[in-house]
Amino acid sequence: MIQLVLLVYIKEKLMKKNILTTLLAAVLYFLCVGIGVFLGHLVDQTGNMFYAPAFSALVGGSVYMLLLTKVPRFGAITTLGLFMAIFFLASKHGAGAFLPGLACGLAADAIARLGNYRDRIKNTLSFLVFAFSTSGPILLMWINPASYEAALLARGKSQEYIDRIMVAPELDKILLFVSSILLCALIGAVVGQFLSQKIADKL
C-alpha cells in the first residue's frame, strides 16, 4: 500500500515537472520565433514573414532538442505546436494560418516517438517537420491571398503595406522558402543536439 502511494506521488511529481518543462520550452521557443522575425527583417525589410520560419528554426533547434531530452514523452512537441497555433490564431494572421502549428507539432511528435525520442536521425527529421509550424502566414498568403489580405486589413494595415509584403507564389520563391527552412532547421537540430548533450552531461 505504501509503495503504491509512493509510486503515485512520484508519477504526479514527474508529470508536474514535465508540464512545467514543456511550458518553459514553449516560452523559450516563442523568444526564438521573435529573434527569427528580427533576423528575417534584417535580411528582408519589406515587413513580411518570409525568412522568419528559417531563422526561428536556426535559433530554436536547441530549445527543441533540449525538450526532447528532458521530456521524452508523446505530447510535449504536440503542445509546443499547439502554442504556435494559438499564437497565430490570437494574432489574427487569417483563417488557416494556425493549421501548420497543429499539423507539424503532431507529425513531429509522432516521428520522434518512432525513435523513443532518443534516435538522433528521427529527432532531426522531427525538427525538420516542426520547423514548418511557423510557416502559416506565408502558406496562407500563397494558398488564399484574398483571406490573407482581408486579415491584414482587419488588423488595420494599409493597402500600401499589403502590396509591399505580398510575395507571389512563384516556383523559385517556393523553393527558396522551403529550402531555407530545411537548411536552417538542419543546422539548428545539429547544434541543438550537441548543446543538449553537453547540458545533459553536466546535470
Predicted features along the sequence, with ranges:
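Cationic, low-complexity basic patches in intrinsically disordered or flexible, solvent-exposed regions
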Residues: 4
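Membrane-embedded alpha-helical hairpins and interfacial helices in multi-pass inner-membrane proteins
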Residues: 49, 126-198
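Central hydrophobic cores of alpha-helical transmembrane segments
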Residues: 76-85, 122-133
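Interfacial aromatic-anchored transmembrane helix boundaries in multi-pass membrane proteins
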Residues: 37-42, 49, 84-112
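Transmembrane alpha-helical segments of multi-pass membrane transport proteins and ion-pumping complexes
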Residues: 26-37, 57, 61-65, 89, ...
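Hydrophobic transmembrane alpha-helices
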Residues: 15-79
